[in-house]
């Protein structure tokens, strides 16, 4: 609510208002530099906001950061893994961090690992994984957490078509289970299979929200226009603002 913040006292995002309901996936889209990553970093508590509120299930990030963060799982664009821990140890760390029932969590972990063809790699260290495999590990660990809010940053990078399909199925499953999902992406063709509501972030503010069809209408796109045309229009607006 009215989130304003950035880096070194410079506001990159200004009065951002965004609500995600249980059982809803929202896509945050916009040009590079529009403020998507900055918004996510504030949501994760990695940056201190200048103004506004971030509340999840009645818990304020500012007032109770520890409780807030236990309800959030994050899939970064660039995989972040501990080099000295095996895949199995990463999974066990998630179970410990989120206080999951050990037996139930391991049953779920095995399902997820099989889905992404990692079931025979539990003893592997991150150095043995390709970039795509590291991304799959991040997906597995984040969905294993069973958090109320899943924050996903550009998830399709490095994933093969089967992994993309499996990821989309997991997002749909999470939404059906009344979880909240916030996803940033440029790959709208795939994202629209799992996300019904999109918010366009432009010049640090939410310019419009709605389905992709509603966003097409807002920017005057023709039915025959590709999604690339949306980014061309956003770029033209940004250039005009800075002229």
Where are these regions (language model features)?
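Catalytic Walker B motif of ABC-type/P-loop ATPase nucleotide-binding domains
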Residues: 150-154
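Helix N-cap at the start of a conserved alpha-helix in ABC-type nucleotide-binding domains
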Residues: 161-163
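Conserved ABC ATPase signature
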Residues: 125-132
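Conserved ABC ATPase "signature" region
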Residues: 92, 96, 104-121
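ABC ATPase "signature
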Residues: 209-210
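Conserved ABC transporter NBD signature motif
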Residues: 52-63, 67-68
């Amino acid at each position: 609510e009215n989130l304003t913040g950035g880096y070194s006292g410079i506001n990159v995002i200004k009065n951002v208002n965004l609500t995600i309901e249980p059982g809803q996936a929202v896509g945050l889209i916009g040009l590079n530099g529009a403020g998507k990553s900055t918004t996510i970093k504030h949501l994760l508590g990695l940056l201190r906001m200048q103004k506004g509120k971030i509340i999840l299930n009645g818990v304020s990030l500012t007032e109770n950061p520890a409780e807030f963060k236990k309800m959030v799982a994050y899939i970064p664009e660039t995989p972040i893994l501990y080099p000295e821990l095996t895949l199995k140890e990463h999974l066990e760390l998630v179970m410990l961090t989120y206080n999951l029932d050990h037996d139930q969590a391991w049953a779920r972990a095995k399902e997820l690992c099989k889905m992404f063809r990692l079931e025979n790699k539990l003893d592997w260290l991150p150095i043995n994984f390709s970039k795509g495999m590291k991304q799959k590990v991040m997906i597995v660990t984040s969905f294993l957490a069973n958090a109320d809010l899943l924050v996903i940053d550009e998830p399709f990078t490095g994933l093969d078509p089967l992994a993309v399909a499996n990821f989309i199925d997991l997002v749909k499953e999470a939404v059906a289970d009344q979880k909240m999902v916030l996803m940033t992406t440029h790959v709208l063709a795939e994202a629209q299979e799992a996300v019904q509501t999109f918010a366009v972030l432009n010049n640090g503010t939410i310019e419009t929200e709605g389905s992709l069809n509603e966003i097409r209408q807002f920017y005057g796109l023709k039915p025959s226009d590709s999604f690339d045309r949306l980014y061309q229009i956003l770029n033209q607006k940004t250039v005009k603002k800075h002229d």
